[in-house]
From Swiss-Prot:
Domain PCI: 319-502
Keyword Protein biosynthesis carried by entry: yes
Quaternary structure and interacting proteins, as annotated: Component of the eukaryotic translation initiation factor 3 (eIF-3) complex. The eIF-3 complex interacts with pix.
Region of interest called Disordered, as start-end residue ranges on this chain: 590-633, 836-1129
Official protein name in the record: Eukaryotic translation initiation factor 3 subunit A
Protein family according to the UniProt entry: Belongs to the eIF-3 subunit A family.
Main location: cytoplasm
Biased composition (Gly residues): 1080-1091
Length: 1129
């Protein structure tokens, strides 16, 4: 499988490798992964992607994968439609060219296959198989071959054209390419005679044009308002019209004409005359094929007018030929019906008038033409004088002269002339039959004006080119449309005209030559004629009566005018004023409406911008979400593909994957695939073991049985083999002995023959040794000298070589020693660093463990203190409620809480019980009385608990020494940095606990009560006594300062203080807002009256010792613990 993310260059190289080994599908998958990967799509230029795209499309064409090619083309369009349109155009043209080449090759292959089949057997051309096949399917060999070989490629080419048109339909940069491909598709339909595909192509182009007309606001969209776009669309529709006419698809041709007319009407530029001439010519042809002679003649007349006006180099022969064509087409129009409204009772869809009006719009006519109007227009244009003498006579005979006895003979001579010269009058031949029908109708009408009755035989003699059946049909049609009054008597074989005087032929004068009116016409107009004659007679008998009546009427009119002229003048003035007022009112309304419309438009535009911005933001969020999902999905798919690729490399993995399809693999993840792989592996192992066991048992039984059966056969075979081997050995040995004896004899005879040559050999050797002795001695001396020199040279080289080897060995040893020392130093340094890191780690772990233990202790203390305080508060709340009821019953006089005269001075720095005894009669007095009645055992327990907490704090952290008296040490560790807190005033809960918990609460409410002077005084006291302030000292005042701050009485603070006290009693004990008012219940100070201006300075009193305030410590611990628990919640 292809890797998930490959660079385009690598993908192209890998695809070429797959193609070389004969795996085009793998190559296509590799390239397809690149286009599906959004990572590389927009990171490379067309020089890198274009070769990849050509290879991709080549593989799609080879494998006939049109849908995969469509996906790649759309991706490529999105990448380069705004960057490099030429690259996109080259890619699309190359793709279509490859598809066309393969289709043409398939067509040639199909023809060649048929030729081979036809020439296979010249002696037996019609085989039984071919005869049966032609009888069954009715197709010849070429059709079957085309269906098998050519048709798949034709389908692929058609899909390619459709995909490219869909790809480029909304891109203004590729508009010319779109129309070129449309023309190529038309040529394809013509070449392969694909009529159904041509209809679908026309519908597709019409749908594209409608989409362009509907929406033209896109960035790369095609605008129909541009002149270039309109011209391209017009040219394409004209080409479509030509193709439809060639394929004889007249319905599609008519739709194309409607599209062309719409484009010409939409265009601001007048179409060129050549285009209009082509349009009228094709329109006339379509009307002719549709059998609509009236509009066919009208289209030819428009073409004649256009050509005559705009074509300057028109010859006389061309003008005469065109005029004859127009004149004959106009005269061939069937005579109209007298009452066409009868057709509306027969038609099922639209009325004929609506259809005619629609067709007249295509010709640019204000109203539908008629035969009379066309003949009148022909005469106005002087067409009869432009044609030859024969056609001029034809017009006169049909429309001017009244000669029924010779009419058909004259027309027949014209018809013979047209038929005789077919080469020159090819365009006029289709009008012959229509011309004959019109001639017969003219003959019948003229005969009806001359004769009351006539025989069939005589009428057929007057109409030689018509038989009796056609004549009777025309007579019935005339009666059906109420053109004439005709009665046929078959018994006498005669025809009667105008016998019914109660019926009229028509209400207007008929067209054509007329001799006289019919009797029914005369009867119908008799009353009109009588009225005319009587009026003329009265005017003759009384010539002055009419003049007197006119004079009298004139005098009455003048008198009436003088009577009403003033009133009428005032009415006119009043009307003029009303009109002016109305105009002003309408103008104001229009201005107001325009302003309102402008405001509304502005508001709508603003809302649209906001909606668009919101939509863009939503789309951006949606894209980001989809991108994130796609990335996650891509990671999963990558992991899955890697796992599948890894599994597919094994035999059992391939077997497991073959059982799953692509959808099944996509539904699984990597773990499930691995699990199935292991299951498949285990199953294969079990199957293999069982097969091996059964095979082993089978082979064991088979071998044992085989060997038992082979024993007697082997014994018999061995006995026979021994006998044969003995015989063979004896024969071979005898042959060997004979050969050895013969060789011995030959060797002895050879030796005896050569003994006589020994003396000559010895003499030759002795002579040769004597001759070569001196030469041998000389060469031996030279060799010894060269040997000595070579020995010296090699000894010197060995000395130099050994010296260099010793030097290199010394350098290597020295370098190794240096490396060894550096390595020892490095190892020692690393050991020291590891030891230091280990020590730091152990130290951090010890500190973390110690901190955790301290936190555990602190948390246990806080939970215990919080639980106790909560119990005390609940109990105190119950007691407060009881005491309040009792005090309300005993109280005699109501007195405001904030009275300055009854507000006591600040409580001394003693315990909380003494402060409660000196408090005024109020809710605070009730609480002090209630606290005195508390159980002594509970107070002792709290004191013991406070002492234990203090001792543990002292042991855990060093005590912080403050010179301002009495602020106990804080054992809490600040969990997060906070902003500098403001000091708490002397309100409720203003004890020492405010210092440690303010960073959690974000400030104290009492700060708003105390004012700036309290803050300045407190700030000065801290600076004088505490030295530099730290972050953990920015809380409220210390508990030993609180009684001093509460001294005096301030009437400004008393309402708020009273409300706060009441609020403390109303709120439940567990409420978070109750924390601020919980201080005074068990702590010293806070909430009492007193004036802050008269309060003594904190440094005037000696701060009490910490151990003298166990109750304060308990309050602090409880308060901080509660706020700590709130923070944790």
């Amino acid at each position: 499988m292809a890797r998930y993310t490959q660079r385009p260059e690598n993908a192209l190289k890998r695809a070429n490798e797959f193609i070389e080994v004969g795996k085009p599908l793998r190559a296509l998958d590799t390239l397809q992964e690149v286009f599906r990967n959004k990572r590389w799509n927009y990171a490379y230029s067309e020089t890198v992607i274009e070769p990849l795209m050509f290879k991709y499309l080549y593989l799609c064409v080879e494998l006939k994968k049109s849908h995969i090619a469509k996906e790649g083309l759309f991706q490529y369009r999105n990448m380069f439609q705004l960057v490099n349109v030429n690259s996109l155009e080259n890619v699309i043209r190359g793709y279509l060219k490859m598809a066309e080449e393969h289709t043409e090759a398939a067509q040639a292959q199909s023809s060649a296959a048929v030729a081979v089949l036809e020439l296979d057997d010249l002696d037996n051309i019609a085989t039984p198989e071919s005869i049966l096949m032609s009888a069954v399917c009715g197709e010849d060999a070429q059709d079957r071959s085309d269906r098998t070989i050519l048709l798949p490629w034709v389908k692929f080419l058609w899909e390619s054209y459709c995909q490219c048109l869909e790809l480029l339909r909304v891109n203004t940069h590729c508009e010319a390419l779109y129309h070129d491909i449309a023309r190529m598709a038309f040529q394809f339909c013509l070449k392969y005679n694909r009529k159904s595909e041509f209809r679908r192509l026309c519908d597709k182009l019409r749908k594209h044009l409608e989409d362009i007309c509907k929406s033209s606001n896109q960035t790369t969209g095609v605008s129909i308002n541009k002149v270039e776009t309109q011209q391209l669309c017009l040219d394409t529709r004209l080409y479509l019209l030509d193709s439809a006419i060639q394929m004889e698809l007249w319905q599609e041709a008519y739709k194309a004409i409607e599209d062309i007319h719409g484009l010409m009407a939409m265009s601001k530029k007048t179409p060129v005359p050549k285009t209009m001439a082509n349009y009228y010519q094709k329109l006339a042809m379509v009307f002719s094929k549709a059998g609509n002679q009236l509009f066919h003649a009208a289209a030819l007349l428009k073409l004649f007018q256009l050509t005559r006006e705009l074509k300057k180099n028109l010859t006389k022969d061309d003008l005469q030929r065109m005029a004859a064509h127009v004149l004959l087409a106009t005269l061939s129009i069937p005579l109209p019906s007298a009452h066409p409204e009868f057709d509306r009772f027969i038609e099922a869809d639209k009325s004929p008038l609506e259809k005619a009006q629609k067709l007249a719009v295509l010709l640019g006519l204000p109203q539908p033409p008629t035969r009379v109007s066309l003949i009148r227009e022909v005469v106005r244009l002087n067409v009869p004088n432009l044609v030859s003498e024969d056609f001029r006579n034809l017009y006169n005979w049909l429309e001017v002269d009244f000669n029924p006895l010779n009419l058909c003979k004259r027309i027949q001579s014209i018809v013979d002339t047209i038929e005789a010269s077919e080469t020159e009058n090819t365009l006029l031949t289709p009008y012959i039959q229509s011309l004959k029908d019109v001639t017969i109708m003219r003959l019948i009408r003229q005969i009806s004006q001359v004769y009351e009755s006539i025989e069939f035989k005589r009428l057929l003699e007057l109409a030689p080119f018509c038989n009796i059946f056609e004549l009777e049909k025309l007579l019935v049609e005339s009666v059906r449309h109420n053109d004439m009054q005709i009665r046929i008597d078959h018994q006498r074989n005669s025809i009667y005209f105008g016998t019914d005087l109660t019926e009229s032929q028509r209400e207007y004068r008929p067209d054509g030559p007329t001799l006289q009116s019919m009797p029914s016409e005369q009867i119908r107009s008799q009353l009109v004629n009588m009225s005319t004659v009587l009026t003329r007679a009265v005017s003759i008998v009384y010539p002055n009566r009419e003049r007197d009546q006119r004079a009298k009427l004139r005098s009455q009119m003048v008198q009436h005018y003088h009577e009403i002229k003033d009133r009428e003048h005032q009415r006119i003035l009043q009307r003029q004023k009303i009109i002016e007022d109305r105009k002003e009112f309408i103008e104001k309304q229009n201005n107001a409406r325009e302003e309102e419309e402008a405001r509304r438009h502005e508001e709508e535009s603003r809302k649209a911008k906001l909606a668009e911005q919101k939509r863009l933001e939503q789309e951006q969020e949606e894209r980001e979400r989809k991108r994130h999902e796609n990335e996650i999905q891509a990671i999963k798919e990558k992991s899955l593909k890697e796992k599948v690729q890894q599994i597919s490399q094994t035999a059992h993995g391939k077997k497991m994957l073959s059982k799953l399809d692509e959808e099944g693999i996509k539904k699984l993840d990597a773990e499930q695939i691995a699990m199935r792989e292991s299951e498949e592996l285990q199953r294969e192992r079990k199957e293999l073991q069982s097969k091996l066991k059964s095979q082993e048992k089978k082979i064991d039984y088979f071998e044992r049985a085989k060997r038992l059966e082979e024993i007697p056969l082997f014994e018999k075979y061995l006995a026979e083999k021994n006998v044969k081997d003995k015989e063979f050995w004896e024969a071979t040995e005898a042959t060997r002995i004979e050969n050895a004896i013969a060789e011995r004899k030959d060797a002895v005879s050879q030796q005896e023959r050569l003994k006589r040559m020994y003396p000559d050999r010895d003499e030759f050797l002795e002579a040769l040794k004597k001759e070569r002795a001196s030469l041998f001695v000389e060469k031996l001396k030279k060799f010894e000298i060269a040997l000595a020199e070579e020995r010296k040279k090699r000894l010197a080289e060995r000395v130099v070589r050994r010296r260099e080897e010793r030097r290199q060995a010394y350098l290597r040893a020295k370098e190794e020693e240096r490396f060894r020392k550096e390595e020892e130093i490095r190892l020692a340094r690393e050991a020291e660093e590891r030891a230091a890191a280990e020590a730091r780690r152990l130290e951090r772990e010890a500190e973390d463990e110690k901190r955790r233990q301290q936190y555990e202790k602190q948390r246990a203390k806080e939970e215990e203190a919080e639980r106790k305080i909560q119990e005390d508060r609940e109990r105190l709340a119950r007691e407060v409620a009881v005491e309040r009821e009792r005090s309300e019953k005993e109280r005699d006089v109501w007195r405001p809480r904030g009275d300055r005269s009854e507000r006591p001075s600040a409580a001394p720095a003693g315990g909380a019980s003494e402060w409660r005894r000196n408090a005024p009669t109020s809710d605070r007095n009730d609480r002090n009385d209630r606290n005195e009645r508390n159980d002594r055992s509970d107070r002792n327990d709290r004191n013991d608990r406070s002492e234990r907490i203090e001792r543990s704090d002292r042991n855990d952290r060093p005590e912080r020494k403050d010179t301002d008296g009495g602020a106990d040490s804080s054992w809490r560790v600040r969990r997060e940095p906070v902003e500098p807190q403001r000091e708490r005033g002397g309100g409720a809960g203003g004890g020492p606990s405010g210092r440690d918990d303010k960073w959690r609460r974000g400030g104290d409410r009492s700060e708003r009560l105390g004012g700036d002077r309290d803050r300045d005084r407190d700030r000065d006291s801290f600076r004088r006594n505490d030295g530099p302030r730290r972050d953990d000292d920015r809380g409220g005042f210390r508990r030993d300062d609180q009684p001093q701050r509460d001294t005096g009485s301030n009437w400004r603070d008393s309402p708020r203080q009273n409300d706060r006290d009441n609020r403390d009693n109303r709120r439940p004990a567990g409420d978070r807002r109750d924390i601020r008012g919980a201080g005074p219940k068990e702590g010293g100070g806070g909430g009492g009256g007193g004036n802050w201006r008269t309060a003594p300075s904190p440094r005037d009193e000696k701060p009490p010792v910490k151990r003298d305030q166990p109750q304060d410590k308990e309050n602090k611990a409880g308060d901080d613990g509660e706020w700590t628990s709130v923070k944790r919640r």
